[in-house]
């Protein structure tokens, strides 16, 4: 239950997609800003209030031309004391994306375990600032928070661990040659 707490998540209209439903399932209210063709600085700057919990950013290429750059979003959000969460579920490879978004200032970044990592389908990584990772842990198993019903099995955790190790050991020159 998010009543009485900040529970609005700002989403750039050009990045609004069906996966936003996961935010609503956790109790968030989405505040969609700008329009599908363009999100302007003043759209973002004027969207923060006492109910704002986070900004959700989706760095997918086909959204990029209508969105503000992540560094700009981070700068504005942090000026308001609001964290930025990046949905990078499908942003691997390149391997550098594992740290790119946090290097650009994002507070949390989520990656799918079941896409390019080739881990279990119902797994993923949450990377970012310790304080936010600890908050995530507070709501998952063995606690009885909102994420309890989506807890990862031991098998999924080990499978994801092995998948990440294999991903990190991959020779990406071969993959890049295939993509060229």
What are these regions (language model features)?
Residues 1-168, 172:
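Conserved PLP-enzyme active-site core in the AAT-like
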Residues 174-176:
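Active-site capping/gating regions of soluble enzymes
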Residues 178-180:
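Mixed-charge interfacial surface used for oligomerization/domain docking
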